[in-house]
UniProtKB/Swiss-Prot annotation:
SUPFAM superfamilies: TrkA C-terminal domain-like (SSF116726). The chain crosses the membrane at residues 4-24, 28-48, 65-85, 95-115, 157-177, 370-390, 402-424, 438-458, 463-483, 492-512, 529-549. It comes from the Bacteria. This is Putative transport protein NTHI0043. It comes from Haemophilus influenzae (strain 86-028NP). InterPro entries: AAE_transporter, RCK_C, RCK_C_sf, Transpt_YidE_put, YidE_YbjL. GO terms for molecular function: monoatomic cation transmembrane transporter activity. PROSITE patterns: RCK_C. One of its GO terms (cellular component) is plasma membrane. The keyword Transmembrane applies. Keywords: Cell membrane, Membrane, Repeat, Transmembrane, Transmembrane helix, Transport.
Length: 551
């Protein structure tokens, strides 16, 4: 067999062993995808003993391509929610997540300066302690740019030393915070449910009876609120007749309007129109129905709802729009993206015609447009290679192969559609590419670092590196968790999700969810901080490398 064939065969063997190890669980907690790293270490230990030669160029390509695949698909996944997570509702949670990252970075500086740990090893320990593999890739990239030799081996070994407690440390922090504040989980869950029901900003339906004499004879568009497109009127009931109103529909006293909007907008409409009636409007004789329709027609991508003329042509109202899990009130100026879910209301005989304009081809949601994938990857590599200069920094910074594809993917996923190209990827396809990428990357890191792992652990500084990893993992989590409880007044379950999200650690999220099942507090806070944290975890090793290398 050629060296390339041997190398690829061993990579497959590493993946099999590593994924098998990752499925081992103790009390529901396992290494997960991190098991691939240890699979690589085990295989590398024996390949060194038997003198098997691996092709260095193949390993290098597989490592870099795996990293690119992983960070790009992460960006596509979190892109739609990345910018919305920075809004007011997530500011407090993201602020505490940033604090964890800052404290962890300070801990790295202390380990490097006071304990005199080499920079590459310190960054490897940092990546393992926060269980973030893209951070490892980003650190290796920037150190290679700075001319530090053998970064893959030393960083891989130190990463592996710190990784196991990186997972366990999060769980320990959750447990200690619970003991310290004598938390009663059932009370926390009840408090979260009560607060979330009050603060929920999703859209609602109400039915209002027109009693304001000033509105009699006005068209719908002339009524304040409708002209501002704050709410949508999906149905109008007059006596025994029910219609889907148009902007030009005249309103009469005692008409019943079914409105869709947020609580504040609906409260304003009560003051303008009249009082709320208990019985919602219903469709008579099956003439009016509603459907949830997915935007899949390439001809409407990037177009405004007004330009489609659906309301004018078919008398169909789009009452709600769900984009990446966020409910919006659609307006005439709303631009449609692939995968948007529209709630459409209209007469049965014409609703299907309107649906055909939007698409609603479910099979398209299972397909992947490969052209946008490679455009995104190509642009990401290009952006990652562009140097930019910051005053006071000794060298030009680059986003690199870890940061470039991530930033480009975030932007493209947020834009959603350019012409007939759409940066939507089915969750199953995204997960598959992401898992392939991270498995390839970790397999190579394990193979490169495995030869010296056991010697470092037994005869070298392995145990010392583990101690530094515990310091970097545990101290920032405990400090932030206590501050979030004392001063942030955060719910304990929310704090657990915050800690798991700040480490981008799915096993920790699974543990947090099991603390109180059927409660979404942990998952919600995890999802809120995850996009920003993933971005900062990739950028922080690069900034630390440049700052500490120059110091």
């Amino acid at each position: 067999m050629s060296d390339i064939a041997i190398t690829i065969s061993l990579l497959a063997l590493v993946a099999v062993i590593g994924l098998w190890i990752g499925h081992w669980k103790i009390r529901g907690v396992g290494l997960g995808i991190g098991g691939v790293l240890f699979g690589g270490i085990i295989v590398a230990h024996f390949t060194n003993q038997y003198g098997l030669k691996l092709d260095a160029h193949t390993l290098h390509f597989v490592q870099e391509f795996g990293l690119i695949l992983f960070v790009y698909t992460i960006g596509i996944q979190v892109g739609p929610g990345f910018f919305s997570s920075l809004r007011k509702s997530g500011l407090k949670l993201n602020a505490f997540a940033i604090l964890i990252i800052v404290l962890g970075s300070i801990a790295v500086v202390l380990v490097h300066k006071i304990a005199d740990v080499p920079l590459d090893i310190a960054l490897g320990i940092y990546s393992g302690a926060v269980t973030n593999t893209p951070a490892l890739g980003a650190g290796q990239q920037i150190l290679a740019e700075l001319g530090v030799p053998q970064t893959t081996v030393t960083m891989g070994v130190s990463y592996a030393m710190a990784y196991p407690f990186g997972i366990c440390g999060i769980l320990l922090a959750m447990w200690l915070i619970r003991l310290f504040f004598k938390v009663k989980v059932d009370d926390e869950a009840a408090r979260f449910n009560a607060e979330s029901s009050q603060d929920k900003e999703s859209l609602h339906n109400i039915s209002l009876k027109v009693t304001n004499q000033n509105l009699d004879g006005l068209t719908l568009i002339q009524i304040p609120g409708f002209s501002d497109e704050e709410v949508v009127c999906s149905r109008l009931k007059r006596d025994d007749m029910e219609i889907v109103p148009k902007a030009s529909t005249e309103i009469r006293i005692n008409d019943i309007l079914q409105l869709v909007g947020d609580d504040n907008s609906l409260a304003k409409m009560r003051l303008i129109i009249g009082y709320e009636v208990d019985a919602p409007t219903v469709a008579y004789s099956g003439e009016i129905r509603s459907e949830r329709v997915v935007v899949t027609n390439e001809k409407v991508l990037g177009k405004k709802i007004r330009a489609l003329g659906i309301h004018q042509k078919y008398g169909v109202v789009i009452s709600r729009l769900n984009r990446a899990g966020i409910e919006l009130v659609p307006t005439g100026n709303t631009t449609l993206q692939f995968g948007d879910v529209l709630h459409m209301v209209g007469r049965s005989d014409v609703l299907n015609q309107a649906i055909s304009v939007i698409g609603n081809a479910q099979q398209k949601l299972l397909q992947v447009q490969m052209l946008p994938v490679f455009i995104g990857i190509g642009l990401g590599v290009l952006v990652g290679s562009i140097p930019f200069y910051i005053p006071g920094f000794p060298v030009a910074l680059k986003l690199g192969l870890a940061g470039g594809p991530l930033v480009v993917a975030l932007i493209l996923a947020r834009i959603g559609t350019i012409g007939k190209l759409y940066w939507f990827m089915p969750p199953s396809a995204n997960l598959a590419l992401r898992e392939i990428g991270i498995v390839l990357f970790l397999a190579v890191v394990g193979l490169k670092s495995g030869g010296s792992f056991f010697d470092t652990l037994v005869n070298g500084s392995g145990l010392e590196w583990m101690g530094y990893g515990i310091f970097i993992t545990f101290i920032p989590l405990m400090i932030t968790g206590i501050l979030a409880r004392l001063y942030g007044k955060l719910n304990y379950l929310t704090i657990c999700g915050l800690l798991a999200g700040s480490m981008t650690d799915p096993p920790a999220l699974a543990f947090a969810n099991e603390i109180k099942e059927d409660n979404g507090a942990a998952a919600l806070s995890y999802a809120t901080v995850y996009p920003l944290v993933m971005f900062l975890r990739i950028m922080s090793p690069q900034l630390l490398a440049v700052l500490l290398w120059a110091a």
